[in-house]
Amino acid sequence: MPKHGRDGATEPGVAGRALDQDRAPSGRNAVLRAVGLVGVVVVWFVIAGLGGPAIGSLSSVQSNDQETFLPAGAESVAASEAARAFDDSGQLPAFVIFETDGGTASPDQLAAWGAYTESLAAQPVLTGRDGSLGTVGDYLVDGPPGRSVPVPLIPSEDGQAALVIVPLSEDKVTAVAADGQDALGDVVDALRTAGDAAAAGGSVHIAGPAGLIADLGAAFAGIDGLLLLVALSAVLLILFLVYRAVALPFVVLFTSISALAMAGGIVYLLAKNDVLTLNGQSQGILFILVVGAATDYGLLLVSRYREELTRVESTWTAITRAWRACLEPIAASAGTVIIGLLCLLLSDLNSNKGLGPVGAIGIASSFVAALTLLPALLMAGRWLFWPRIPRVAEHLGGAHAITHRARPGLWEKISVFVVRNPRKIWVVTVIALAVACAFVPTLKASGTSQTDVFLTDVDSIAGQDALSEHFPGGSGNPVVIIAPEAIAPDVVAAVAGIDGISGEPAVVTAAGTGPQAAGAPPLVVDGRVQIQATLSAAADSEGAEDAVRAVRAAAHAVPGADGRVLVGGNTAVLVDTTDTSVRDLKVIIPVVLVAVLIVLILLLRSLIAALLLVAATVLSFGSALGVSALMFNHVFDFPGADPAVPLFAFIFLVALGIDYSIFLMTRAREEVAFHGPHDGVMRGLAVTGGVITSAGIVLATTFAALAVIPILFLAQIAFIVAFGVLLDTFVVRTLLVPAAAIDMGWFTWWPIRPRPTKHQLAQRRPVSVGP
């Protein structure tokens, strides 16, 4: 039995008997194990070969239509479903806006713009990778038998612009062809090309839902190539700096790429069969999560493997010990992230629900690859570490000792500094982080307009600006009200007086709502009519959202409404999305905290240590959010943020940020069992400092790569998570957590004090601390 000192730590000394379970394989067992390792590698090559092409096809199963993200119970969704009874053509309109260079349109310009509408259906469209030839008419909604749908030219009142609403068929332009692409972007390009030819000295823009979705698709087109290239290149560079080896960085990176192939293949199959919702944001986050997590897990395993190679000659024994030592912290880390991501299933937004399983699949793939493929590849031998090949160290100071070099390394110095000043360090750190938290209320996360979605100039936003300048702000995006025919006049009267509504709301007739519909009877379907009201402000503006809320309040208050009046439209979709995001924030965050706390208690077998890590991580998250608010408002000059930004940042920072504290405290618990609560934590920090810092830098770099996609949401997530991970790595895990744990002593590990296991007693041999 090992002897214990007065503080409960195991005293130096060699374990009574060495366990023989880790002996190097020989003879028949060696052959079987070699075959098994080769089999693992072959299986992963097959996975990479099958899953790799699926990564490039993920864009073909994306859905970036905001309405599809909302729950079926949202009023705007119910209104949209009801409106299909009045027009089942399934339009995805494109707004073609012609405008002059500042003066009134000349007769020649008006004639050219009018000719554009007449020849529009015959304009050629080159679609697909094979350049198949079609026409715009192939993608218009179907008109009455023998007749085409009219596409009129609508001049502006100021005479400086004209609007053409092109009724594209949503089913036709979004249908995925054999090459995995839809035709929307090509059709919009055809509309723009023909418009440029007909501008007659003016300018043309393509806006509306079709133009916006096409521009979103173009922005996310960089995910498959540019984002992966930037992320993988940055990670490879960091791995070279960390390992200073020729082959090892490629081994770790290949593991990450294989994990991505596995995750991409699974997500593609599930999205293709409508099991989950995938959008451009989820795809980008999937790539970053897999590359970052798989590399982090690989760093931890390789670090422990290298440590064991300084203790034993056999690479099999070294990888077996390293695998066993890393299994628990990596499993806890992956489990924490997966649980946090799956909490998104509680969201009422389908886009958030989709990200939950998408991200969980990515983390699970990273976990499996890091603990199967990477160990098999590492069995190639010590030469992978060339030119810094680890050698077995001399015995110094007993079986559990850690050797120190003549010149202490950086993390040895930091650990000594922390153990000498624990209370002062954690108090000062908490105060500094609390000051940063004070700026959280300044984060403007109440939503942004669609014109603020892009970080670069895009044509659909320029078109929306031109539309707002020359036409009523909500032109082309009316508020849609579905009401019983009997109370329709009362609803019209109630809505007409609302601030933010332009003109008199119109009841839809069989001839439409324009001048041609004057005197026509209303179109009645199942006892209901459709009313359209034009907003005076841009449909995606805060003023328009306020007007929609007022319309809902007024329409629902009409006698006889009784829940039968529905208010929808594009602006209503934005309102419902914002409201649902705020609700998700209040529901999901507490659930994530409780789930993470339970995982930590089970892992560390200590309520106090688990509470310490959760509290430190929440404080770190608040600090990151506060600093981000300052940067967004005063440096980057962002217009605001989506309500989902704080939620996603919380999920990633709490689930991923706590990883480093998990890695630290699991090793600290092992050391505390031998050296007590002070020296044990100090040694845990010294041994893990280099690898955890490298892992933090890798994860921060991969998330920062999201900024190459010119979308406001992704840029904000990139900054918050990258900064938060670095803050957690260099401040929380380095100073706050170890200082507080040392200051509380054995109480940190209440109620179950750490005790060494038989494997730990048998395996502890000296290892040099440092990179």
Labelled PLM ranges:
Residues 64-65, 101-102, 399-400, 449:
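A short, structure-level motif marking secondary-structure boundaries and short turns
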Residues 72-93, 102-210, 442-640, 770:
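Structured non-transmembrane domains adjacent to transmembrane bundles in polytopic membrane proteins
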Residues 99, 434-435, 511-512:
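Short secondary-structure capping/turn micro-motifs that flank functional sites
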Residues 95, 428-431, 479:
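Short coil/turn segments at secondary-structure boundaries
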Residues 59-60, 93-94, 98:
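Short, conserved active-site loops that position catalytic residues or coordinate cofactors/metal ions
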Residues 1-63, 126, 171, 175-445, ...:
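Membrane-embedded transmembrane helical bundles of large multi-pass transporters/channels
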